[in-house]
Amino acid sequence: MGRPLEGQPLRALDLYPEPAFLRSGKDPKSSPASSPSFAVLGPEVRSTGGQAGSRRRPSAPCSQDRAAAEGAPALLGGSPSSGSPGHPPGSAFGVEAGCRALNVSEHARGGFALGLPFGLSGGAYLFLLLDGAGDPKPTPEAPISSADGRAWFPSESSWQLPQLPAGSTSGSEPRARPGLGPRQLLTGPRDGAAGQGPGRGLTARLGREREIDCGPRQAGHGGTATDTGRAGSGARHRPPRDRGTPGLRTH
């Protein structure tokens, strides 16, 4: 800026903001990387060339252009963390863009996918599970009694039912009536029992009414006493035919 303009041609002075390769078309001495106004153009600008109406907008530089601008070769393929020929450790993709891929690969290899915040591999995590590191307490071994050879637990007495004396039954099982065999059990209210069924209850009430109305003398001479006795003893018999007139029996 402080140099005098006398004695110097105008072409030697860089008075234009555009670089030399854009003004003259091709300039082998100037490179895109050394130009201050270097910008990578989008694919639509490159394909249209210099046609009218084409949009010229700068896009974000990709990894290859960025590596070319920094002077490092950008090769595709290989792993950025292993230093393979695809991505040298000093390349732009291996240093900057490969940092996230390196972190993800380390987390996945270190057991992050299994939910572990620390670096345990899948084999070590499986070994800890199989070895019993996650069990709260091992099950204590039950002592074996020498009498019957069975394992005895402290809470075994609470599992057993209370033992009943011989000959007694529990409350849930029906008890046998006195005078009946072991197979003849009373399972419910039998039809005809006094006050429980429609047959014998009605007969017993009619028998008692006859005995009250006719008196003990008439009941002893007639057949009503026999019916009353049968009704009281609990034996099955047919009810009297005439229920309207107590004490009389029609044939």
From Swiss-Prot:
Region (Disordered): 1-92, 137-251
Low complexity: bias regions: 69-92
Biased composition (Polar residues): 155-172
Domain of life: Eukaryota
Name of the protein: Putative uncharacterized protein LINC02875
Organism of origin: Homo sapiens
Lineage: Eukaryota, Metazoa, Chordata, Craniata, Vertebrata
Gene that produces this protein: LINC02875
